[in-house]
Regions:
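Acetyl-CoA-dependent GNAT
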Residues: 1-50, 61-63, 67-71, 124
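Short hydrophobic/aromatic beta-strand or adjacent loop that forms the aromatic wall/cage
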Residues: 12, 116-120
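A structural microfeature
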Residues: 25, 106-109
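Conserved glycine-rich acetyl-CoA-binding loop
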Residues: 48-63, 88-95, 99
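Conserved acetyl-CoA-binding loop of GNAT-fold acetyltransferases
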Residues: 97-107
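Acyl-donor-binding surface of acyltransferase catalytic domains
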Residues: 106, 123-126
């Protein structure tokens, strides 16, 4: 679709989790700014509902970080900050992100939609 092609053109990176030839999870990320900034965004993560709670999300986050680290190192730089946005009322996501090492950095009021606040979660690297 056009949205997928647009994402590829913007340098989105895709990582999938596969079990018995079935995709059970997906995470996407993209770099922001110049490579020297080491800034990248977790754009999307989704796990097949019947496979949740089995470490797949954590594994995808780990692979995302390794992939981004490799990508930045290929340019002579290193990762500094991974961030994401999530709806303020998505409590399950907040619990997950905090469990895998993200910190709630701030909340953006009416960020995408009126009356829908977004939380910004970040993970910093040395």
């Amino acid at each position: 679709s056009e949205a997928f092609i647009s994402e590829i053109e913007k340098d989105f990176h895709y990582i999938v989790a596969v079990q018995n030839d079935v995709i059970i999870g997906l995470v996407t990320w993209l770099p922001h700014g110049l490579p020297k900034h080491g800034l990248f965004e977790l754009d999307r993560i989704c796990i097949l509902s019947k496979t949740r709670g089995k470490g797949i999300g954590r594994g995808l986050i780990d692979k995302l970080i390794k992939d981004a680290d490799r990508w930045y190192k290929s340019m002579g730089e290193s990762i500094r900050k991974l961030y994401l946005f999530t709806h303020e009322d998505n409590v399950d996501a907040h619990i997950f992100y905090e469990k895998v090492g993200f910190d709630h950095e701030t909340t953006l009021k009416d960020h995408y939609y009126k009356y829908q606040n977004e939380r910004v979660y970040s993970k910093f690297f040395n």
